[in-house]
Swiss-Prot record:
The keyword Transmembrane helix applies. Signal peptide: none annotated. One of its GO terms (biological process) is cell division. Pfam families: Glycos_transf_4, MraY_sig1. Its EC number is 2.7.8.13. GO terms for cellular component: plasma membrane. It comes from Thermobifida fusca (strain YX). This is Phospho-N-acetylmuramoyl-pentapeptide-transferase. It is found in: Cell membrane. The keyword Transferase applies. PROSITE patterns: MRAY_1, MRAY_2. It is an enzyme of class 2 (transferase).
Length: 351
């Protein structure tokens, strides 16, 4: 528990102290957000707001994670480091995307194929890595089984698992990216998801098969350290939300959204809760589904289901205030997280 508290506290402090000078530097070099012409007209006032604020989240999280290990005088684990590497790697892809947007003064950065290639390169390294490095109990950071609340079904071939993991990584990182359209929306939703993973990691530690071979135990390699990773990211996101709350003084950009999406899916794979992520990140799923429905409907029928996709912009065009949308969407995400935690606990109880 000391490591969890230390990670969150250090990350929060580092990110909070870093953000004001980062905002000033980004303003000075005119690293501001480019707004799409076809977006909601109210967003025109956000033109030039500093972006790439995800740098502070990433830096704070990394310092918080390794700082917590310094405080507790314990070495980082393979599972924790792999999730951090996925987090930083996808953040680098997002940074390139943001930098191109700023350099070329346009709302679109990396071409979709180039962004996908970057996600695949980082994702393949993570997916292969989690199938390696068994501990003395033969537990690896990840499992080639499918998982919902724990592993189930027969193991997949490693190559098939890599494809499955890539699908999860690309889908989740892009889902968080789509959600990052209103001040504070993606940050708040991610905070709620990270709280879930702090709880899951801590619970799996207490019910680990390493400590007691009981029917309801978990075969997760490094549950405590995964909770530390989640806590470090949680601290960074809370600090960022202070400056990202409406009206935002800084945006996380793709630097932050791709990184946080990668972190969430990395935690899902290593805690053996791959499919539960659909509930823990329920808001991200809803918003992504709205884009799929909108594009599919327009291509098939020539008609749009929503006034605009992603879903948050549909409600903007209906006249909802931005803060109203954000708070109501946070409530929806909170209900998803509560449902996921209930499922997680109820599955454990009967065993």
């Amino acid at each position: 528990m000391t490591g969890i508290i230390a990670a969150a506290g250090i990350s929060l402090l580092v990110s909070f102290l870093l953000l004001p000078p980062l905002i000033r530097i980004l303003y000075r070099f005119k690293f501001g957000q480019e707004i799409r012409d076809d977006g909601p007209q109210g967003h025109k006032t956000k033109q030039g707001t500093p972006t790439m604020g995800g740098i502070a989240i990433i830096f704070g999280t990394v310092v918080g994670y390794f700082g917590a290990h310094a405080v507790t005088m314990t070495p980082p684990t393979v599972s924790g480091v792999l999730v951090i590497l996925l987090f930083v790697g996808l953040g680098c892809v997002g940074f390139l995307d943001d930098f191109i947007k700023i350099y070329k003064r346009r709302s679109l950065g990396l071409r979709s194929g180039a962004k996908m290639l970057g996600q695949i390169i980082v994702g393949v390294g993570f997916a292969i890595g989690v199938t390696m490095f068994p501990n003395s109990y033969t537990y690896t950071p990840g499992s080639t089984h499918l998982s919902l609340l724990r592993d189930f079904g027969p193991p997949m071939a490693v190559w098939l698992f890599v494809i499955w993991a890539l699908l999860l990584i690309v889908a989740t990182s892009n889902a968080v990216n789509l959600t990052d359209g209103l001040d504070g929306l993606a940050t708040g939703a991610t905070i709620l998801s990270l709280v879930a993973y702090v709880i899951i990691g801590n619970w799996q530690l207490r019910q680990s098969c390493i400590n007691a071979l009981e029917p309801n135990c978990y075969t997760v390699r490094d549950p405590l350290d995964l909770a530390v990773v989640a806590a470090a990211a949680l601290g960074g996101c809370i600090a960022f939300l202070w400056f990202n709350a409406p009206p935002a003084k800084i945006f996380m950009g793709d630097t932050g959204s791709l990184a946080l999406g990668g972190l969430l899916v990395g935690l899902a794979i290593t805690t053996r809760t791959q499919l539960l992520l659909l509930v823990i990140g329920g808001l991200f799923v809803l918003i992504t589904a709205s884009v799929i429905i909108q594009v599919g409907s327009f291509r098939l029928t020539g008609k749009r289901v929503f006034r605009m996709a992603p879903l948050q912009h549909h409600f903007e065009l209906k006249g909802w205030a931005e803060t109203t949308i954000v708070i109501r969407f946070w409530i929806i995400q909170g209900l998803f997280v509560a449902a996921a935690m209930a499922l997680f606990y109820l599955e454990w109880m009967p065993r």
